Each structure stands twice: as structure tokens, then as C-alpha cells.
């Protein structure tokens, strides 16, 4: 991949300033108006399921907002979205991925004829991805006759050496492919009922699909049929259900 174009550098600089101001203002408001800020964060957490997640209390995650680790992760996500080129009806990137056996393959290899293929990007340290994983499994149970499903394990959302939440799974940032494969194997305990692959260490599928920290897509015959909004706030398996129901009707 070549160097970013000057226009992209300017956009990155602008996003850097936006995120920096957001974090500084957030820290100040958290000091001056702690109760109000916490209520706002809880309202956002309601969309992701964090407030209903039995594995986390408010003190496990709210104090991590506006930290240095928060800044770097949000900046990474915002920069990634600047390079999002996927669009409805457009060609779905045929990125290289790795099966849990270590065999390399491509996303398109999981398409079967004209059957839609649901792509679910996420990681074990992403609470909303894990909290809504049973919803995803119900999609497989209800629509496996007309669609195929694939989980693509990407870099950790809340690695223990990054923007970490207390009481979360203890997984460090992946230093090599073996680390990523080991982390993905932990997902098998949730009985995903579909193939699980991992992104390459170049994070190619995560970048081209702008998937961090989690995201849903449906592709059909190599084209993007559905493009879910970015997680965690807008990660919604029920939108996938609505699309599949329409296809099935």
C-alpha cells in the first residue's frame, strides 16, 4: 500500500484535533459535572447493551472514558473510517483471512452461488459484540436455509494492554498471527455455529470494511447488499434479520 495522499493527511490531522478536543472537554466536564456526564455515558451504553450486560458494573467501564487509552483507540477507529470505501451495491473487498487451522483463504470463498453471506466482524473483548452474539446465533438458526454466515475475528476492541475494561476477558493486543488465532479460539466456547476466521496481521479486512470495533455486512454475488453502521453504538443484528426476512418473503 502506498503512502496516504495529502488530502487524507489533512483529514487525519482534523480528526486528531477533533478527538483531542473531545477528550479534553470530556475530562473537564467529568470533573465539573460527574453525575451528568455519567448519565450521558449510561444513555449511550443502553444502545450497546452495556447497561444490561451482567458481566459489567458501571464502575468497570465508565471511568475509562477520556483516558489516554480511550484517546488512542477512538483516534484509530476514526482514522480507519476515513478510508472506508465500501458502499451499497459496490464490490465487496475480497480480503485475505485465515482459518483457525492456519489455512489462508479469502472472504469470497465462503460465498455459495447467489446465497447471501453475512459477515460479522468483532472480537472477544468487545462487550457489545459478545453481548449480542446470541442474537447473531439466532439469525443462523432462523436463516441458514437461505444464507451463509462468517465471523471475522479482528483486533481486540478492549485489549488488557489497551483501552481495557475491568472484569472483561484478559486478552492482550495481538503481536502475531498466533496470538490472534488463540484469541479467536476462545470464541468457540460460544458455539458460533458458523465458520470463524481471523483477519491478517495487516488488518486488511478490518480496514477495507471499516469494521473496528465491530460491524455487520451482507454480501451477495460479490456485492454489498447491506452495510451495518459502525459499532458499538449502532451494531444491530436485528437489522440483518429484517434484510434476510425481506429476501425470504
Swiss-Prot record:
Origin: domain of life: Eukaryota
Record has Endoplasmic reticulum as a keyword: yes
Activity regulation annotation text: Deiodination of substrates 3,3',5'-triiodothyronine, 3,3',5'-triiodothyronamine and 3',5'- diiodothyronamine are inhibited by 6n-propyl-2-thiouracil (PTU).
Main location: membrane
InterPro entries: Iodothyronine_deiodinase, Iodothyronine_deiodinase_AS, Iodothyronine_deiodinase_I/III, Thioredoxin-like_sf
GO molecular function: selenium binding; thyroxine 5'-deiodinase activity; thyroxine 5-deiodinase activity
PROSITE patterns cross-referenced by the UniProt entry: T4_DEIODINASE (PS01205)
Membrane topology: Single-pass type III membrane protein
Enzyme class per UniProt: oxidoreductase
Residue ranges, Cytoplasmic side: 34-249
Gene Ontology, cellular component aspect: basolateral plasma membrane; endoplasmic reticulum membrane; plasma membrane
Topology feature Extracellular, residues: 1-12
Result when mutating residue 94 to K: In THMA2; reduced catalytic activity, due to a 2-fold reduction in T4 substrate affinity
Coiled coil: none
Entry keywords, A to Z: Cell membrane, Disease variant, Endoplasmic reticulum, Membrane, Oxidoreductase, Selenocysteine, Thyroid hormones biosynthesis, Transmembrane, Transmembrane helix
Cellular localisation: Cell membrane; Endoplasmic reticulum membrane; Basolateral cell membrane
GO biological process terms, semicolon-separated: amino acid metabolic process; hormone biosynthetic process; thyroid hormone catabolic process; thyroid hormone generation; thyroid hormone metabolic process
Known EC number: 1.21.99.3, 1.21.99.4
Function: Plays a crucial role in the metabolism of thyroid hormones (TH) and has specific roles in TH activation and inactivation by deiodination. Catalyzes the deiodination of L-thyroxine (T4) to 3,5,3'-triiodothyronine (T3), 3,3',5'-triiodothyronine (rT3) to 3,3'-diiodothyronine (3,3'-T2) and 3',5'-diiodothyronine (3',5'-T2) to 3'-monoiodothyronine (3'-T1) via outer-ring deiodination (ORD). Catalyzes the deiodination of T4 to 3,3',5'-triiodothyronine (rT3) via inner-ring deiodination (IRD).
Family per similarity comment: Belongs to the iodothyronine deiodinase family.
Disease: Thyroid hormone metabolism, abnormal, 2: An autosomal dominant disorder characterized by slightly increased thyroid-stimulating hormone levels, and elevated serum reverse triiodothyronine (rT3) levels and rT3/T3 ratios.
Record-given protein name: Type I iodothyronine deiodinase
Source species: Homo sapiens (Human)
Gene name linked to the record: DIO1
Amino acid at each position: 500500500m502506498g503512502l496516504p495522499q495529502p488530502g487524507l493527511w489533512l483529514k487525519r490531522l482534523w480528526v486528531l484535533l477533533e478527538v483531542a478536543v473531545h477528550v479534553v472537554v470530556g475530562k473537564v466536564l467529568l470533573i465539573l459535572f460527574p453525575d451528568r456526564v455519567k448519565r450521558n455515558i449510561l444513555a449511550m451504553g443502553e444502545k450497546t447493551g452495556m447497561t444490561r450486560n451482567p458481566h459489567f458494573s458501571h464502575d468497570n467501564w465508565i471511568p475509562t472514558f477520556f483516558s489516554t487509552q480511550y484517546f488512542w483507540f477512538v483516534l484509530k477507529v476514526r482514522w480507519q473510517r476515513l478510508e472506508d470505501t465500501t458502499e451499497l451495491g459496490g464490490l465487496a473487498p475480497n480480503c485475505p483471512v485465515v482459518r483457525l487451522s492456519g489455512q489462508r483463504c479469502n472472504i469470497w470463498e465462503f460465498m455459495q452461488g447467489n446465497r447471501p453471506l453475512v459477515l460479522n466482524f468483532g472480537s472477544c473483548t468487545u462487550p457489545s459484540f459478545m453481548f449480542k452474539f446470541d442474537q447473531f446465533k439466532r439469525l443462523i438458526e432462523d436463516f441458514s436455509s437461505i444464507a451463509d454466515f462468517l465471523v471475522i475475528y479482528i483486533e481486540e476492541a478492549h485489549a488488557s494492554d489497551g483501552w481495557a475494561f475491568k472484569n472483561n476477558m484478559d486478552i492482550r493486543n495481538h503481536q502475531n498471527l498466533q496470538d490472534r488465532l488463540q484469541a479467536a479460539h476462545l470464541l468457540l466456547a460460544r458455539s458460533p455455529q458458523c465458520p470463524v476466521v481471523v483477519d491478517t496481521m495487516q488488518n486488511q479486512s478490518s480496514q477495507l470494511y471499516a469494521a473496528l470495533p465491530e460491524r455487520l455486512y451482507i454480501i451477495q454475488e460479490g456485492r454489498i447488499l447491506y452495510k451495518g453502521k459502525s459499532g458499538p453504538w449502532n451494531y444491530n443484528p436485528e437489522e440483518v434479520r429484517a434484510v434476510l426476512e425481506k429476501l425470504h418473503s
